[in-house]
Each structure stands twice: as C-alpha cells, then as structure tokens.
Amino acid sequence: MNNRKVELTRKTRETDIKIKLNIDGNGESHIDTGLKFFDHMLESFSRHGFFDLEINVDGDIEVDDHHTIEDTGLLLGKCFREALGDKRGINRMGYSIVPMDESLSTVAVDISGRSYTVFNATFQYQYIGDVTSQNIKHFFESFAMTSQMNINIKAEGENDHHICEVIFKALARSLNDATKITHNQILSTKGKL
C-alpha cells in the first residue's frame, strides 16, 4: 500500500490553514479552527473514518465563519485527492447510514474525479453553536469540489446538532469504505479516475 499521507497549507488574506491527513490512520485528531462546533464535527469525521487529521486554522472569524469553513473544506478535499494519488486499488464508492437519537443520515460517495454535491438536509435555526447552519452545506460543496468526488447527502431529524453530526459521521464512514484498497485495479472503464 502506498503511503497515503499528505500535509498541505492554504494561505489567503482571509485564512491561513495547515492540514495533515493520514487516510490509513487510527482516527486520531487535533483540530483547531477557532470554531468549537466545527472542531467537534471534524473530530467526529476523523474518528469515524479512522483518518488521522490535524487541522490548524487562523481565519477571519471576527467577520464571520464563512471563509474558515469554506477554505477548510477546500484544503481538506485537496488533501484527500493528493493522498489518494491515482486511486489504484480503492473501492471508489462507499455509502453509510448513520443514526443518532432521532436523526438519520445516508451518505454515498464516488471518488470518480467528478465533483458534485447533493445536499438534502435542512436545519431549523440559523446557528448551530458558533457555526452558521447554511455554511455546513457549503463545507461539503467545497470539499467535493477539490477532492473531485461525488457526494450525495440525505439527512433528517429534529435536533440541528444531531443532524449535522450524523452527516459528518456518515461521510466519514462512506469515505473509509471508498478509500479502502481491496484490489489492484483502477475502477473505471476509462482506465483512470
């Protein structure tokens, strides 16, 4: 198995981000985005996907959370894309159904080289902790764009925290399955992903 680890940075006038990712990790994480609820979601993502993940963000959260969440999604997606290399041997697709109390999420991914996001979930309130709820969808769109994955998300429930958390957990489990190396082929009739 190739070494599927990567360390990348992204620096703009709005954010300064450093991410270390080990796809074949143990679910260990150190996350500091400046947004406690977002940290909690990314920690859940790391734990349930068995990805080792370090994220440090210095973002303009005095403005709002948009740039921090968007740019973290962009860089994390790029980390996955680079760590997977030519994608030889991976399952390519994965899905998961995750419950949490009254909430349920189904997430399916295809590491196809084509970016697309379907997000079928709604939140009752404008904020979940210190995060604007509309930026949750934007995180997944940003992640899908740079990872070049198709991500299809469906979630329902009554508690916004639970809905958001089951989405992150279901994505993690889906990606854990999709990134597993189980053969020596590139699963595409084109010969590349």
Curated annotation (Swiss-Prot):
UniProt record similarity statement: Belongs to the imidazoleglycerol-phosphate dehydratase family.
SUPFAM superfamilies linked: Ribosomal protein S5 domain 2-like
Enzyme class: lyase
Domain of life: Archaea
An example Gene Ontology biological process: L-histidine biosynthetic process
HAMAP family in UniProt: HisB (MF_00076)
Organism (species): Methanosphaera stadtmanae (strain ATCC 43021 / DSM 3091 / JCM 11832 / MCB-3)
Keyword Cytoplasm: yes
Record's keyword annotation contains Iron: no
InterPro entries membership: IGPD_sf (IPR038494), ImidazoleglycerolP_deHydtase (IPR000807), ImidazoleglycerP_deHydtase_CS (IPR020565), Ribosomal_Su5_D2-typ_SF (IPR020568)
GO MF annotation list: imidazoleglycerol-phosphate dehydratase activity
Keywords per UniProt: Amino-acid biosynthesis, Cytoplasm, Histidine biosynthesis, Lyase
Gene name for this UniProt entry: hisB
Protein name per Swiss-Prot or TrEMBL: Imidazoleglycerol-phosphate dehydratase
Location(s), subcellular: Cytoplasm
One Pfam family here: IGPD
EC number in record: 4.2.1.19
Major localization listed first in the record, in broad terms: cytoplasm
